[in-house]
Amino acid sequence: MSAIPAEESDQLLIRPLGAGQEVGRSCIILEFKGRKIMLDCGIHPGLEGMDALPYIDLIDPAEIDLLLISHFHLDHCGALPWFLQKTSFKGRTFMTHATKAIYRWLLSDYVKVSNISADDMLYTETDLEESMDKIETINFHEVKEVAGIKFWCYHAGHVLGAAMFMIEIAGVKLLYTGDFSRQEDRHLMAAEIPNIKPDILIIESTYGTHIHEKREEREARFCNTVHDIVNRGGRGLIPVFALGRAQELLLILDEYWQNHPELHDIPIYYASSLAKKCMAVYQTYVNAMNDKIRKQININNPFVFKHISNLKSMDHFDDIGPSVVMASPGMMQSGLSRELFESWCTDKRNGVIIAGYCVEGTLAKHIMSEPEEITTMSGQKLPLKMSVDYISFSAHTDYQQTSEFIRALKPPHVILVHGEQNEMARLKAALIREYEDNDEVHIEVHNPRNTEAVTLNFRGEKLAKVMGFLADKKPEQGQRVSGILVKRNFNYHILSPCDLSNYTDLAMSTVKQTQAIPYTGPFNLLYYQLQKLTGDVEELEIQEKPALKVFKNITVIQEPGMVVLEWLANPSNDMYADTVTTVILEVQSNPKIRKGAVQKVSKKLEMHVYSKRLEIMLQDIFGEDCVSVKDGSILSVTVDGKTANINLETRTVECEEGSEDDESLREMVELAAQRLYEALTPVH
């Protein structure tokens, strides 16, 4: 049994190459109807070089039609320059405008602060720059189509420009949330709930079954912790990524400092080589933020801070007395946040506040277990005496938000990604419990490991739209409509051949077939043999040469020493032409047919003889009173009030008005007339 072509298969396949039972290197492959889509292309923050990549070697990048990036965090877009510049990928790449603007600077910073050799670097600043030309942008709610894949995006909250993508292939809809948050904060709106129900939901599970504390409580705890650190004369370190949660925390701190004059002498630094560029981007894209920010921008730009200074590097930092420094990167693997941590960790007055999610294998995750000492980047051991607090401002959904989101959409299939193995397992169990007694909603929950595929079957109805000339008249029940079936991507249309050029790139062509066959016998012998075969033979003259029209579509022309067949090529005409050819070859090659040939002596039968005999014959069949002659060339037969008229010249029979439905009378009279004509035709 031959394999079903990918385009016709009902199998939909989802395979995580990253973020399968882990957080980091998000990269999900979707395959359906011969199309392949990559959702995100990130790196693992806890790994380096090629080890940080998703399992790209399991796919052929050249087969990917479309790549969609949900937001600018490294674990979602960090491998993109490598994928665009160092692989055979030739598809199209999309992200939102804000994501593209920030991606450029965030990855530039990643290249600069990565603490690995040039040989191990995945890509250079040049690769990053060149990748920008290959990235296209999409507006929220704007519908685009690539290779028959329709897609559009919704606000996801989480960070500026973050998007959830709705993808539609052959009528099957899939929603990929990326990272999302259903809670509005100081500058971002909550993730939207799409008004279209997806068949499949690929959703993050970062926090599993945890419930976040209330925003007000969390902000108060954060501000109080910072206040306590500077009150005791310490330095407060808040490791963050240059963009994202950093802007939320800056808004909180700036407002808190404004309301506490006693803190005005204590500096707050935003320490990132990207500080200025990042803030310029945030000041540009206020329209992608929530209503509160959009209203405030008319009075003043909330991202022009009064109590916060930018700090480009340690060279510009005067480390005297208490201060608060927000430094990147967020997991302290390298860069400014790592330098400051190593120089401050031995003083118990100092404190570090981990404000976001931390991946396994990073320093930030390690110090949350409060070890007695840490290892510096140079390999030295240092005692850890500074306070360590974890106050999560990570804009990911908690169980309550995730559960409500799923309840609103009711997708038949939920695929969990972007979550540590145990958290994901707990979330899966909780979701299954939630719906196990619900007879109305049936939801299957999947949590695939990296490289493990989830296979689903979607058998959609194939509907064909009738368009153009064929659609001009409303069809009646039972009417047969025939045309050309045109498939474009996953849409079917039935068109008249004359409409092909209007609705498609196709043009209607006709092929005229001409075939010459050697023939030396009498031409009227051919007429006789073909008449015996079909009865549908018409005698013609074409350019003063004898000719026959057989089956209404095949022309046979007599030429010296041969006959020429002409017809318009199509399956039925080709079959008729083969039949006529067989008769000609048989007559030409079989002497017996020629010897016993019965030739027509007269092309025309005496009309008055035929008329009289036919009248007698029909009177015998139907009765004397039923048959009458009209104006010499037409005989009428009337039976039970139904009348059929015979044209003696053409031997065609037509029923009079009111008798049209009596097909059996017409056929009987026509058959009698034809048989009598053939019997009376003079032969010798």
Swiss-Prot record:
Cross-link (Glycyl lysine isopeptide (Lys-Gly) (interchain with G-Cter in SUMO)): 462, 465, 545
Phosphoserine PTM sites in chain numbering: 659
Entries under Gene3D superfamilies matching the protein: 3.40.50.10890, Ribonuclease Z/Hydroxyacylglutathione hydrolase-like
Obligatory cofactor(s): Zn(2+)
Note on cofactor: Binds 2 Zn(2+) ions per subunit.
PTM section of the record: Sumoylated on Lys-462, Lys-465 and Lys-545, preferentially by SUMO3.
Subunit: Component of the cleavage and polyadenylation specificity factor (CPSF) complex, composed of CPSF1, CPSF2, CPSF3, CPSF4 and FIP1L1. Interacts with CPSF2, CSTF2 and SYMPK. Interacts with TUT1; the interaction is direct and mediates the recruitment of the CPSF complex on the 3'UTR of pre-mRNAs. Interacts with WDR33. Interacts with ZC3H3.
This protein's name: Cleavage and polyadenylation specificity factor subunit 3
Annotated source species: Bos taurus
